Amino acid sequence: MILKRTLTTFENQNLKRCKIDSEIEYGRKKGEIIVYKKRQRATVDQPCSKEPELLTSSSSSLTSKEESQQVCSDQSKSSRGRVRAVPSRFKDSIVGTWKSSRRKGESTESSHDDDDVSLGKKVKGFSGSSKLHRSKDSKVFPRKDNGDSSEVDCDYWDVQISYDDANFGMPKKSDASRKGVYKPEEFTVGDLVWAKCGKRFPAWPAVVIDPISQAPDGVLKHCVPGAICVMFFGYSKDGTQRDYAWVRQGMVYPFTEFMDKFQDQTNLFNYKASEFNKALEEAVLAENGNFGDAEIISPDSSATESDQDYGPASRFQGSYHEDIRTCDGCGSVMPLKSLKRTKDSQPEELLCKHCSKLRKSNQYCGICKRIWHPSDDGDWVCCDGCDVWVHAECDNITNERFKELEHNNYYCPDCKVQHELTPTILEEQNSVFKSTEKTTETGLPDAITVVCNGMEGTYIRKFHAIECKCGSCGSRKQSPSEWERHTGCRAKKWKYSVRVKDTMLPLEKWIAEFSTYTLETQMLDKQKMLSLLEEKYEPVRAKWTTERCAVCRWVEDWEENKMIICNRCQVAVHQECYGVSKSQDLTSWVCRACETPDIERDCCLCPVKGGALKPSDVEGLWVHVTCAWFRPEVGFLNHENMEPAVGLFKIPANSFLKVCTICKQTHGSCVHCCKCATHFHAMCASRAGYNMELHCLEKNGVQRTRKSVYCSFHRKPDPDSVVVVHTPSGVFGSRNLLQNQYGRAKGSRLVLTKKMKLPGFQTQTQAEQSRVFDSLSAARCRIYSRSNTKIDLEAISHRLKGPSHHSLSAIENLNSFKASFSFRAPFMSVFCFLGATFSEYLRKILISIYLVTHQEADFTSFRERLKHLQRTENFRVCFGKSGIHGWGLFARKSIQEGEMIIEYRGVKVRRSVADLREANYRSQGKDCYLFKISEEIVIDATDSGNIARLINHSCMPNCYARIVSMGDGEDNRIVLIAKTNVAAGEELTYDYLFEVDESEEIKVPCLCKAPNCRKFMN
């Protein structure tokens, strides 16, 4: 084996041993043999001897015996004067001195060493006449402008190279390397190095590799910026795989120069010395050119003289099959089966898997068609016409022009020829346009024909929208980006993909050159807005329930922020959400739209009818409070009264042309999702359960509110969703508000018993429950076990009446007038007398006259409505055996959604008294019925109250409770309202809304058996 120190890459050289008796005899005395390499003559016009800065010239004759002895004696002694000997494991090798070439490349003391250095060092070059380029930011790999790069010896150099080009391929010694710290830039692919994985890890022999073509995918995924990829010699502990690493500055050292320092390491970090010795021997063989199992295929591996004629693949014909080819993209050598031909590539072009992916993603130069490689340096420019990247050098872009392109448009040569938009023509057009801007503005066409992806459309300058001519869109107007997607174009750049049909000029250029007016900066006026609202639409008629606030959709209310209900349209809102003063009489309150019932009010921002409407500063235009909240340009002049709404004319006009994804209509102004371009009306999103958030923050001493709406794709809609408020103190929603503000939540009823079992809890069988009693014991002394035979039966309603042969609906029709007139004694007595004495025909006539003359009039206040509810409650509800727990409340007749059912009555006590009563009821084993209506007032219906206390809890209720204020200093009342349509005989339930408690000890189990049961009421 012959070991050369000056090789920086893997190289197979034909070395010839010099047979000089005197030199060999002297070397044997020192334990060394000096090998001389026969010098070859240069065969090019400018030999390497003419580059004194690059390569040291060598002598053509051998030195004398005395000179060689002096050189060898200087090299064989260390700084202490000791004679260096070859390690025992290299006794069968022909080895020179370890440090004979450490700094000899820079000195000219020995002519023999100069010969070794001059012939051993290599420079990076090209087989063509291209000039080498390398930027300062290059980490590991040199710049390659084509795929024919190779490493050649100076003796076979066939290209004229300058001084800078020659130094490019050689690692430059920096100040840091002189101090023992080497940068990754100083090493190239194929260099043998000592690499360390950490400060406490040993230095291990390794080779620098190309991570793209030589490293596994797992190594490439964990790429570290500013580091080089190395492959360690030797095998891992399983003995089958190689180890790879990304090494940074200070953890990599030249192999030859640090051989003496690292070959005698003792701390190998759990590695065996035998493994280290095998790796070292493998590295020594690799430096000599004998790779063995460690041979790797490198795109930058050196080419021999024969390789220049037959290509890189000819080097592997001896050990590989004949179907080995090189990738035309990166130059990697691999089997032909793993190479692919892409649709966009040339017929004879073969690409590897990695390069084919880059080709499909347009990661290649549009001029030279060279695929982008991580090792490539230089500048790239993206064409604004076709979205293709181009080498700056390929288009002869200077550094000054490259800086100017950051603020200007760039077009590749193909786009320049196709559209004739050279920079000089653009400058002339801009100059002409500036001079004639005022004269051409008035003569602009209102519409122009545009084309994209083979589909035509009409661009309307007034609305900055495009009307498609495909036939299926009709008269629908779309924004340029939407129409671009509609045509099937994937460029996502409508400014350049949408072009004017006549001149094929990009639409953005046409707008910039012939119009200074865009719709984004256009200010609307009343006439234009009314013209946008004149189009026909289908009104969305919504059911406004009193369960939730029509603005924030919360179900909770508080003493200082009560839920109020309009006496006419039955719309429920919070006082703060609608701007209602606390001094107003809430029993006869009507909303702003119902103050003038003869005039119909509609929102100008959405097609939804009714709701919480507020007037704007424009006469005749009204808006929903929710629409004004989530429209950034709209606000309220008075935040306390929440009116009037201002900023309607600041809304972009193109928002009135968007199609709502929920109601499928264009009437009104649409908002879009904060994550994508999905458009919808704010009120439609609120009714559909979309996630809506208000972010309140303070910036520079100014209170700011940011609104966010999420579409159904980015957040799953929920019918019970509410407006979530984000503040610096926390996030407030419908359920977690109970955790953040104790004592301010809506009142709830607590029902507890001693023997509560979790749903699904399996009790013992009767065989296990049966006890073995003494045969002589009395029956009254035995423990009584309750029978469970009727637990799973359906709910049964109890009606106080005798036997009946008629259906329930027939009986309800006969007694319907009683519910309307509720025990009016004079009329009822007359009716009974007439029914007993007159004929049936006269009886029906009198009943009809009575119903017509005594119809239920509209209530002027909530107090009157509540009195009527108390008189007729026995005709609406009854009690019965519940299928949930104990006794329950049942509907005696069919009840419509939103209809008031019954008032929850009891004794009003303070909070402290209610706590004492609850403890007393528990000690007696009684069920307690407590309903909290405010922070200090609780209604106790345990001993005194009406039938409403029997209503049970359900996670899917058909009723909800509403706390209403009577005004004039009177106490609040609790009313149960139907949430859905309830059939006669159906059990009435509502959600208790207990305060959420995380402790398992005081959890109250839920027995409702609903599909969405929460298992616990709290």
UniProtKB/Swiss-Prot annotation:
Database matches in InterPro entries: ATX3/4/5_ePHD (IPR041955), ATX3/4/5_PHD (IPR042011), EPHD (IPR034732), Hist-Lys_N-MeTrfase_ATX (IPR025780), Histone_Mod_Regulator (IPR050701), Post-SET_dom (IPR003616), PWWP_dom (IPR000313), SAND-like_dom_sf (IPR010919)
Residues in Post-SET domain copies: 1002-1018
Disordered: region residues: 39-150
Keywords: Chromatin regulator, Metal-binding, Methyltransferase, Nucleus, Repeat, S-adenosyl-L-methionine, Transferase, Zinc, Zinc-finger
Catalytic reaction(s) noted: L-lysyl-[histone] + S-adenosyl-L-methionine = N(6)-methyl-L-lysyl-[histone] + S-adenosyl-L-homocysteine + H(+)
Superkingdom of this protein's organism: Eukaryota
Positions of the SET domain: 875-993
Residues at which S-adenosyl-L-methionine binds: 885, 929, 952-953
Cellular localization per UniProt: Nucleus
Entry binding sites for Zn(2+): 955, 1006, 1008, 1013
Keyword Ribonucleoprotein listed: no
UniProt GO cellular component terms: Set1C/COMPASS complex
GO MF term list: histone methyltransferase activity; zinc ion binding
Biased composition (Low complexity): 54-63
Biased composition (Polar residues): 69-78
BP terms from Gene Ontology: methylation
E.C. no: 2.1.1.-
Residue intervals of every PHD-type zinc finger in the record: 658-715
C2HC pre-PHD-type Zn finger ranges: 600-634
Biased composition regions of type Basic and acidic residues, renumbered to the chain: 135-147
Coiled-coil annotated residue ranges, if any: none
Domain PWWP: 189-258
Main localization (coarse): nucleus
General function of this protein: Histone methyltransferase.
Stated family: Belongs to the class V-like SAM-binding methyltransferase superfamily. Histone-lysine methyltransferase family. TRX/MLL subfamily.
Protein name per Swiss-Prot or TrEMBL: Histone-lysine N-methyltransferase ATX3
